[in-house]
Curated annotation (Swiss-Prot):
It comes from Bradyrhizobium diazoefficiens (strain JCM 10833 / BCRC 13528 / IAM 13628 / NBRC 14792 / USDA 110). It is found in: Cell membrane. The chain crosses the membrane at residues 6-26, 35-55. This is UPF0391 membrane protein bsl5717. It is a multi-pass membrane protein. HAMAP family: UPF0391.
Length: 57
């Protein structure tokens, strides 16, 4: 859950920085948030597949 929380924090930083006109910080924060979100999705899918196959017994 921590990775998803950090992704949301960086997303909020990106939005606030974009509204205030700091486009460099906004773009960097958006990239970090996107990366962390995809890492979270991959971990979720791996654990879901493992839960449905190996750890079922």
């Amino acid at each position: 859950m921590t990775i998803l929380k950090w992704a949301l924090i960086f997303l909020l930083v990106s939005i606030v920085a974009g509204v205030l006109g700091f486009t460099g910080i906004s773009a960097a924060s958006a990239d970090i948030a996107r990366f962390l979100f995809y890492v979270f999705v991959v971990i979720f899918l791996v654990l879901l597949i493992l839960g449905l196959t190996i750890f079922r017994a």
